[in-house]
Swiss-Prot record:
Belongs to the ABC transporter superfamily. Spermidine/putrescine importer (TC 3.A.1.11.1) family. Part of the ABC transporter complex PotABCD involved in spermidine/putrescine import. Responsible for energy coupling to the transport system. It catalyses: ATP + H2O + polyamine-[polyamine-binding protein]Side 1 = ADP + phosphate + polyamineSide 2 + [polyamine-binding protein]Side 1. The gene is potA. Its EC number is 7.6.2.11. InterPro entries: AAA+_ATPase, ABC_SmlMolc_Importer, ABC_transporter-like_ATP-bd, ABC_transporter-like_CS, Mo/tungstate-bd_C_term_dom, P-loop_NTPase, Transp-assoc_OB_typ2. Residues 11-332 form the ABC transporter domain. ATP binds at G43, P44, S45, G46, S47, G48, K49, T50. GO terms for cellular component: ATP-binding cassette (ABC) transporter complex. Its main location: membrane. It comes from Mesomycoplasma hyopneumoniae (strain 232) (Mycoplasma hyopneumoniae). This is Spermidine/putrescine import ATP-binding protein PotA. The complex is composed of two ATP-binding proteins (PotA), two transmembrane proteins (PotB and PotC) and a solute-binding protein (PotD).
Amino acid sequence: MKNIEKSEIIISLVDVDKEFGDKKVLDQINLDIKRGDFVTLLGPSGSGKTTILRLIGGFEWTTRGEIKFNGIDIKDVPAHKRDTATIFQDYALFPHLSVRGNIEFGLKLKRIKKKAEEIPDVVWKKFEHLKKKWQDKQKRKIKELKILQAHLEKLLENPQLDIKKRKKLQDKLDDSDFRYSNWENYLTSKSESFKKKYLTRRITKQEINKEITDIIDLVGLTGNENRAISELSGGMKQRVALARSLVIEPEIVLLDEPLSALDTKIRQKMQVFLKKIQQKLGLTFIFVTHDQDEALQLSDKIAIIRNGKIAQYDEPKQIYDYPVNKWVANFIGDSNFFQAKYIKKNQVEILGLKLYTIHDEFIPGQKLDCLIRPEDIDIDLNSGYFKGKVIQNIYKGSYYSLDIKVENTIINVETNDFYDLETQVFIKWDDDAIHLMEMENAEI
């Protein structure tokens, strides 16, 4: 496993907007992803999560904003020049090639560094000379663009501008931002082109064979090298797609709902496998899904996307236990919500009963949403906070899901014990099971 410094930001999206015609699909996206993290973009269909992935991969252009890779804006860099590999939902494997042929495809273009003794001194001198010229040109062009952008921003401050003129100026500013990104990457692009031509060589057949053998062993495909893609199961196709992406040694692997077509058992196995591979190699994985359980199991961090905005970005446990609002809580898991009133420090009123809470950040008298997860509620036949009766009992395999009616409120509870319908029970919970948040009227 690589020694990864996780405090380092590898990808940063800054004030990113994306518009398709008159429709804005992403609105002020700000997202920092640390090197070596497994980050999931989670949201309902049409929320914008796949668009974010495509922007990072270079398959779509931003309307405005920055996509920084190791601190440099790369929004104008084409997909094939980004240090990423993408695994698509349909795998995008070549049906006419074998397992080996699919994996080998990217390696044919791979180049590796020449040994220092293989490079004449004159080449290094030429590189240093050209590098100075490229740096000077880069500085000059960036300075010109900064002056232009300052001028355009000043003009846009005028409140008297009509809509047509404002749009024209904004378009010029957006265009200059793309050109700025291009010149930010100018030195790197020129240097990489020079290095590719003079300081690297093509990978040999022997080296290709070794890399293919190593990656096939890593993803568990040994013995299947010569099989046709049409002969493989969904899980094996997924392993081929993963091997093809990993063998080119990208810094970031982008995964667009790659497990959605698999049946439940294979999908669960592939979830474990993906996480194991990611941790072993220390790569950055950015994963798109609409499956909440999948996101919670796989991720170091989750970005929940709603209507083109990031609703919450945090570690899975933080999002599950401390959602920022009612919508996030409902989306990430089963929920019981109550209207609550904050009485004073560490005291809240729920269903007419004053209870202790660990929360101390609200104002006395403030009306709040109160979340209590079904698995955090305990059932007792003798005593508790509230008395109710069981009106629904569903067996879920490892637990029972009960609906308990307390006066006019239905409360969902998960329990290992069976209770007959109409059974009178009491319910209670620990102090830290109460999660308070500011009220939000929107429903999922």
